[in-house]
């Protein structure tokens, strides 16, 4: 009987919620021949991930979990990134790659620069699952978009290695810098939350809410739905960390509200005509966006370069091959073409 081959590499997943488990299910595939270790403060989450086959072993201590790992993926909330980085920094082996998936990059890159030795490499990533969320057994990130964000002066080989995760997950890649990413998050993630908050406060703190709450229907409920299952400390930390970008986005939102108030100051017929035009334009634009969002990988899919498999990348990066800088340049060129 032939003995099983030694694992090509070791991967550690810190954070075993829905996304961390989905990443594990992709990386623990037998054909990749990787040893996947999981770590989560929630023992129940770790047990479920182990039982699902997303990880091969549970380690309660994050530092021990990272010892000897070639790749460490942080799938934890933004508020937990800094303490996790500080907790694992001394355990990381030379040339280990740490991929963090938080929704803000500038602060996480600063924390990594303070905590991690120079010969350990951090790369930012953010996964946008397609909508609607696929039903099992379809993987969560099938046809998703993996945004890759590189810190200044980052190692190009580590960046290429991170890019290899995308096809393993069934996702496509898109490259942006940290400032651009955080600015986009201010508009697409943080501004909607604050507008939901402002809508709720504008209505509930005005005279008449005592009676108004009885007649408020699904329109108001949907407009304030982002407040439903919110983790207030985590959300507040994100908003505060991105406050400069968010303040600019609020300024743009105020300009739009002022324009709407100007329209409402006209006569009834003119107001209705102008509002109808704006509503139709917004409805059509949103429809196009939702159609594209359902399959973000369709954009210029034929421009994605051929790159070695993740298994080959493990072998090449961690001792069995040479630098792959030409490959990552091709990946960057393809991503740049997507933006044009």
Label the predicted regions.
Residues 33, 93-96, 118-120:
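A short helix->loop->beta-strand "cap" motif at the edges of active sites that frequently abuts
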Residues 2-61, 67:
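NAD(P)+-binding Rossmann beta1-loop-alpha1 motif at the extreme N-terminus of oxidoreductases
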Residues 250, 257, 261-265, 271-340:
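NAD(P)-dependent dehydrogenase/reductase Rossmann-like domain
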Residues 62-97, 147:
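Rossmann-like NAD(P)-binding element
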Residues 112-185:
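Rossmann-fold dinucleotide-binding core
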